[in-house]
Amino acid sequence: MFIVKYYIAGAILAFISLLFSTNIYIGIFSAWVGLSLTLVSLAYIFDLPWIFRKKTNGSIPFYIRWLFVPFLLGSQLYNFYARKYDKVPAIQKIDPQLFLACRLFPSDIPTLQKAGVSAILDVTAEFDGLDWTAENEQLDYFNLPVLDHKSPKSEELLKAIYWLENHITHTHGVVIHCALGRGRSVLVMAAYLLSKNPSWSVEQALTKIQGIRATANLNKVQLKALKRFHQEGLFKLQTPLWIIANPVSGAGKWPTNKAEIIERLSPYFLLHILETTEHTSAATLTQQAINQGAKTIIACGG
């Protein structure tokens, strides 16, 4: 919680400046800064990441961006400086198909594509993501809004794990990033590694990450949350949801809507998708799914 002290101090100084200002423009600017930092302080005190209204595609509404310009500008300058002088590379490969990074910029897209990354998990709340860039470059993008130095709620963390598993299962390289690549992104990556390695301890998962990214370091709040989630068995993934689709029936709606369906279901289920062909019927695929332990099967098409 130490970071909130700086926001509170900044808000107080801004309102003091407003109180003693005789210039209307300085007064307006001081009020703007004071209001922005006050709202940010409240967000941190009460753990309200939604205050930034960041959407799952990483975008923040225009009016929110203007309200928080003093904070967002300061945050961007700090992130840029910290990244430039960081001891480790901005993007690092932790596991096959799994990368860890600090704040990403559009200039990072070619590097990600060269590394085989086609999906981005953004675990920040306080700044715009690569929403338009990712869409233009056909990258899958998902935002899990978490405030700096905080940990996600259990249900939100589970969404991230399912989303990661669905993309990695389909041979997509995935990068998880926060502001500095040290806390929030490390927590989510450790949670995913624990879901894939049930016999591991929290310490083993963190050691795996820190062996590559030396600056990875959870604070006390984040470490306590990760250990609690692990003890509660949160990372035990449920039985997959199977989808059997006929791509030509229903006027061919499945190919048109497939990407959206996957996007909507990925944060909630492990997806196994099978498609019928001229020589493979839905009945054959259904039996195949049952033989592999399927408990829930959804038929699409027609």
Residue ranges and their predicted role:
Residues L194-I209, A294:
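Phosphate-handling active-site elements
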Residues V188-L193, T286:
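Buried hydrophobic packing segments
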Residues Y81-G173, N197, Q204, N217-L223, ...:
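Cysteine-based protein phosphatase catalytic domain of the PTP/DSP
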Residues E137, H230-I297:
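ATP/NTP phosphate-donor binding region
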Residues V123-T124, A245, G301:
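Glycine-rich, N-terminal phosphate-binding loop of Rossmann-like dinucleotide-binding domains
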Residues L104, L180, T277-S281, G301:
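Short beta->alpha linker loops
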Residues F2-W132, G211-L237:
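Cys-based phosphatase fold recognition centered on the PTP superfamily
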Residues T171-A190, I297-G302:
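A phosphate-binding catalytic loop at a beta-strand-loop-alpha-helix junction
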